[in-house]
């Protein structure tokens, strides 16, 4: 059974992402591990309280009580979605969020991470350094990131951007694995700029290789890469965008609200970020 880590602070963004996590667990036949972390108080050594252990125990107990109170609410959500059969376990940990996420991934052999994100600029804050954005750069497993505005709906069309590189082909195969489980179609976009070095022969080879797969290739000539990708998301009605998480700066530019007025409509799209260097092969992870 695949293991899906779901870090939560019980915020509206996290609660919204929880539904996506449940549905994703259903698709990959997985179980959810809910993680909640809390920070310990920081004291200067000069003023370190003698009763620190008492303070720690009190804080830990209050966090446990709060955590315990939230669990029934999540189970109620699972029941409402008819997904209460999904296996769930819980972990409460003190300390740094990213450190604990990496620790759980290693200890529990996590296959996927699902997190919610929120902010005035939607995906802009995600890629500019929120907890979610920091996590995506720190882990080596696929991560589904869900903005607050992204209410769950059946995924019919998955968008994937490519530059026709070998690493892109491997990633596309991984995306197709997931698409088949969702009974979804993959729309693969290549923005061909005036300086493109991708040959027509390469493009045709990909067309031939994936001819029997649920994927449609689109080659759009343009030097406005980011605008073209956003138009693609909108006009092809993309429900989930999949990208290799190797160029964070590109993500930042792509989802800047100032880039286009159309951003408001694209900021509600979940993003599945694949790492180039993964601890395990994604196809093996996704296969059920």
Annotate each language-model stretch with its function.
Residues 116-117, 142-148, 271-275:
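Short beta-strand elements of ligand-binding domains
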Residues 132-150:
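Short, structured interface segments
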Residues 128-131, 202-204, 255-260:
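Charged helix-capping and loop-helix junction motifs
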């Amino acid at each position: 059974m695949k293991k899906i880590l779901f870090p939560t602070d019980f915020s509206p963004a996290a609660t919204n992402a929880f539904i996506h996590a449940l549905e994703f667990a259903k698709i990959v036949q997985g179980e959810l591990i809910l993680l909640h972390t809390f920070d310990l108080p920081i004291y200067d050594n000069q003023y370190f309280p003698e009763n620190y252990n008492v303070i720690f125990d009190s804080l830990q107990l209050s966090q446990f009580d709060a955590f315990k109170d939230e669990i029934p609410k999540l189970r109620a959500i699972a029941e409402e979605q008819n997904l209460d059969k999904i296996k769930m376990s819980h972990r409460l940990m003190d300390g740094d969020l990213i450190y604990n996420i990496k620790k759980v991934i290693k200890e529990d052999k996590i296959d996927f991470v699902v997190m919610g994100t929120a902010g005035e600029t939607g995906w802009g804050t995600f890629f500019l350094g929120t907890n979610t954005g920091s996590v995506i750069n720190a882990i080596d497993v696929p991560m589904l990131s869900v903005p607050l505005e992204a209410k769950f709906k059946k995924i019919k069309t998955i968008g994937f951007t490519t530059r026709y590189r070998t690493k892109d082909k491997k990633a596309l195969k991984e995306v197709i694995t997931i698409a088949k489980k969702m009974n979804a179609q993959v729309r693969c976009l290549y923005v061909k700029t005036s300086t493109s070095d991708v040959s027509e022969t390469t493009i045709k080879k990909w067309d031939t290789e994936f001819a029997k797969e649920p994927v449609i290739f689109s080659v759009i000539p343009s030097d406005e890469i980011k605008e073209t990708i956003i138009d693609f998301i909108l006009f092809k009605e993309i429900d989930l965008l999949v990208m290799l998480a190797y160029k964070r700066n590109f993500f930042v530019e792509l989802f800047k609200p100032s880039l286009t007025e159309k951003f408001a409509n694209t900021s509600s799209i979940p993003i599945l970020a694949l790492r180039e260097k993964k601890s395990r092969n994604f196809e093996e992870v996704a296969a059920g």
